[in-house]
A protein has these predicted regions:
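Substrate-binding/catalytic cleft of secreted carbohydrate-active enzymes
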Residues: 173-175, 300-302, 310-527, 532, ...
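Accessory beta-strand-rich segments of carbohydrate-active enzymes
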Residues: 3-16, 37, 48, 52-159, ...
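Beta-strand-rich structural segments
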Residues: 174-177, 231-233, 562-566, 713-730, ...
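Short flexible loop/turn segments that cap and initiate beta-strands
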Residues: 185-188, 222-226, 559, 567, ...
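Accessory carbohydrate-binding/adhesion or oligomerization-edge regions at the termini
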Residues: 1-42, 121, 471, 475-478, ...
């Protein structure tokens, strides 16, 4: 058994020519590294026609004579979207799904002891009669060999697949499938715990290996314990010869039980309230073509930064590296068959059914996956078709339920869970529809598969009010899905902004639906999710203030709502050095069902009137109520406040004077406000809002140590313009000039504008080890540098 990474040495042409597959090729070809995208696109105003092409890849290699009598298998992690593989001019394999892996047996076409050629005809055109194509699609589909490639040299008989079914109590059942002549062969399995203890089992090929492992630690969201299974295919020795290991497969898995009932989701017998986001697997410039480290980073952002416990992989199976990270972090995954609204003819459906089978077979050992999507997202009912998809999935994996995201009520429910894209909220009333009014079978599970961002696209540079409205809508969706009995939870739409087709988005080919921008910089809405984390240390405390406290940014210069998104116990507010008030979450208000409801800051006067106006406590409280009402209602006063003015013997001029002094209007001196997050009785985080005195450019490299190999690696970089207190400057739109010293290259442009005070870039390795420095320069701010260390795996 030999394994080789095959991500180097590829040549690419954007226009396929039959000469590409021949042993000798005189075409002009571009050297590329895998993962590869057929076309690097601009951040916005891109053209989806540019990546739609019939292109080709070619790789030459030497096949040693020692491979005689062996099986040579070439595996592609994903090729978007229709791939035909040739070896030495001979057509060997065709694969018509851009989101699943496939393996090609090269053995019969090889010339041993000679140079050989593998070529791939890659069709990324969107007129293909395969999923997800056929209708309009609200995301780009890109093209190319965008996941890793590998070559395996095996015996003629080998293991094709290993699948382990488990229960939380330790029961397991191991299934295998083989290729080649295996008469007389046996199986040997070993399960290794995280502590290193081992348990061995043996079995025959015709039956699954079953057993019970005592004292297991179940895989859960809080404790994602992973075990390792190694299965060997053994040919018994004869005539005194020892047994021979023909093949070996190692997988990671977890012991856990998933159950959906009318009351919700139960993991290992414990109810779980799903709080998740939808994730597209696309990135700025590169589309789908990003290495494992970037895929894993998204899982870390979802779990650690955003506080999610679940993710929906909209709208296709996603990177194995992403799923590995979800396994490790305890992030539940709802993955689904490729497609968007459209259902095609019988040929299209046959391919969709094959996609379902490949999705399940390739992903079913991941304990993080708790739900299979057996419908095309948002599609109409099709009883015959969806009976087949559900049957295929349950036959290959009886341990997990199925669902299917639909856009309409009372849809035919062939799955185990009714998943509903709920875009009913318009800012008033309930943020999600009544479960009973939607599901066609109240005895089954129910979840909200999408809500939120599509209803109010929000750019990072939108005004303060717009950004706040989006955040509060996300909060309402989370809250109401929790509050409604029988709803298993919700998946907000969506994690990050994404490029889309001309029929969608904001006219610049971007859907600004995310709680983050395309570079994974957080918008205000991200704090809604992040603040739901349970803090275990001061570093876990979130404190995000919705307002910049700049009157000139608000309509009419009249201050309006100010909200704080936090998981602290309380928030203290100061004006200058004067304490105003302490605020706690309203456990009976609009967001009472949330673990950590957002806090409305509705008192900007507090005890100031006692200190500076000589009022007694009762009078000060009445007067403060008048001033805060004026702030809330644009200087209007209710009859109650007018009565209070009479009671306090306050004239309108006197009330106006105090309003100008303690709250302010356009032209009055700007106050400095300090917000303090209190946790366990002490201040652990502070936000200051005051006029900007200096501008800094902050550069964060999220993965500063890179490893070149088995593919190129990549550093994700976030850029933010901040003031002297570290607060984001959302209207800073300066250009940032980027340059690199050392073995890295910038993906995309070397000059990037700040959007909403934020930007980003990606730095790709080049095959060399060393130290690289990213230089960031912005007019009006000091230069900023960041250091990245690059290692080569072979080194």
């Amino acid at each position: 058994m030999e394994h080789y990474d095959w991500n180097e040495g590829w040549l690419f042409t954007p226009r396929f020519d039959p000469a590409l597959v021949r042993p000798e090729c005189g075409l002009e070809l571009e050297p590329v590294r895998i993962p590869h995208t057929v076309r690097v696109l601009p951040y916005n105003y891109c053209n989806e026609n540019e990546y739609q092409c019939l292109c080709g890849y070619r790789r030459e290699f030497f096949a040693p004579r020692e491979w005689a009598g062996r099986t040579v298998l070439l595996t592609f992690g994903a090729v978007a979207h229709d791939a035909t593989v040739f070896c030495n001019g001979r057509r060997l394999f065709h694969h018509a799904c851009g989101y699943t892996a496939f393996t090609v047996d090269l053995t019969s076409a090889l010339h041993l002891g000679q140079k050989n050629v593998v070529a791939v005809r890659c069709d990324s055109r969107e007129d293909l009669n395969i999923p997800p194509f056929g209708g309009q699609i609200d995301h780009l589909t890109y093209g190319g060999i965008y996941r890793a490639v590998s070559l395996d040299i095996k015996e003629p008989a080998y293991l094709r697949d290993v699948f382990i079914e488990t229960k939380a109590e330790g029961d397991f059942r191991i299934y295998t499938s083989t290729v080649g002549e295996t008469v007389g062969c046996t199986l040997q399995a070993e399960i290794r715990s995280p502590s290193g203890s081992r348990a061995a089992y043996s079995g025959e090929l015709s039956l699954p290996i079953t057993g019970v492992l005592n004292g297991v630690h179940p895989w859960s969201i809080e404790h994602p314990t992973l075990y390792t299974l190694t299965v060997q295919l053994i040919r018994p020795g004869s005539a005194g010869l020892p047994d021979r290991v023909l093949d070996e497969k190692t997988i990671r898995f977890g012991f856990r039980t998933v159950q959906f009932v009318a009351g919700g989701l139960y993991l290992n017998g414990q109810r779980v309230e799903l709080r998740g986001l939808n994730r597209h697997q696309s990135y700025a410039y590169q589309g789908y073509a990003m290495p494992d480290s970037i895929q894993r980073l998204d899982a870390q952002i979802l779990k650690k930064d955003l506080g999610c416990n679940a993710v929906r992989t909209s709208h296709s199976p996603q990177s194995p590296a992403f799923l590995d990270a979800c396994d490790e972090l305890g992030l539940l995954v709802f993955t689904e068959m490729p497609g968007w609204r459209y259902i095609g003819d019988e040929s299209w459906k046959a391919q969709a059914l094959q996609n379902c089978r490949e999705m399940v077979c390739q992903c079913r050992n991941h304990p993080s996956i708790f739900l299979w999507g057996a419908r095309v997202n948002g599609s109409a009912d099709d009883e015959a078709f969806y009976k087949r998809t559900n049957e295929a999935i349950h036959r290959l994996d009886p341990t997990r339920p199925t669902a299917g995201a639909r856009n309409h009520r009372k849809s035919q429910l062939l799955e185990d869970v009714y998943a509903y894209n709920d875009y009913s909220y318009r800012g008033r009333g309930a943020a999600c529809e009544a479960r009973a009014a939607v599901t066609s079978d109240p005895r089954k599970g129910y979840l909200i598969s999408e809500f939120g961002g599509q209803q109010l696209p929000t750019k990072p540079f939108d005004d303060e009010t717009h950004r706040l409205v989006q955040a509060l809508r996300y909060a309402a969706g989370i809250n109401d899905s929790i509050a409604q009995q029988g709803v298993a939870g919700s998946f907000g739409w969506c994690m990050a902004d994404y490029n889309t087709h001309r029929e969608f988005g904001s006219g610049d080919r971007i859907c600004y639906h995310g709680v983050m921008d395309m570079f994974r910089n957080p918008k205000l809405s991200a704090a809604v999710y992040a603040s739901q984390k349970t803090p275990r240390s001061p570093s876990d405390i979130v404190l995000e203030v919705s307002s910049g406290m700049a009157l000139g940014d608000l309509p009419g210069g009249v201050p309006t709502a100010c909200w704080v998104f936090t998981n602290a116990e309380s928030v203290r507010l100061y004006r200058g050095n004067d304490y105003i008030a302490e605020f706690t979450p309203d456990r009976h208000g609009r967001f009472a069902a949330m673990t950590h409801p957002p806090i409305e800051i509705n008192d900007f006067v507090g005890s100031l009137l006692e200190k500076y106006e000589g009022m007694d406590q009762a009078s000060a409280q009445m007067a403060a109520a008048i001033l805060n009402e004026m702030r809330r209602d644009a200087m209007e006063l209710s009859p109650l406040s007018k009565a209070r003015m009479l009671s306090l013997r306050l004239s309108w001029n006197e009330v106006a004077r105090m309003y100008y002094k303690y709250i302010g209007v356009l032209g009055t001196p700007c106050a400095a406000y300090r917000f303090e997050a209190v946790w366990h009785g002490r201040t652990v985080r502070t936000v200051v809002r005051e006029p900007v005195q200096s501008v800094r450019l902050e550069c964060t490299v999220h993965n500063p140590i890179l490893t070149d190999g088995p593919t190129w690696d990549c550093a994700a970089v976030s850029l933010r313009a901040i003031d002297q207190n570290g607060s984001l400057l959302p209207y800073c739109g300066e250009a940032v000039q980027l340059s690199v010293d050392g073995p890295l290259k910038i993906i995309g442009p070397s000059v990037v504008p700040l959007r909403g005070g934020m930007a980003g870039t990606y730095l790709a390795t080049t095959g060399e080890a060393g130290r690289a420095v990213l230089h960031c320069r912005m007019e009006g701010a000091l230069d900023t540098d960041a250091v990245v260390t690059i290692r080569c795996r072979d080194a």
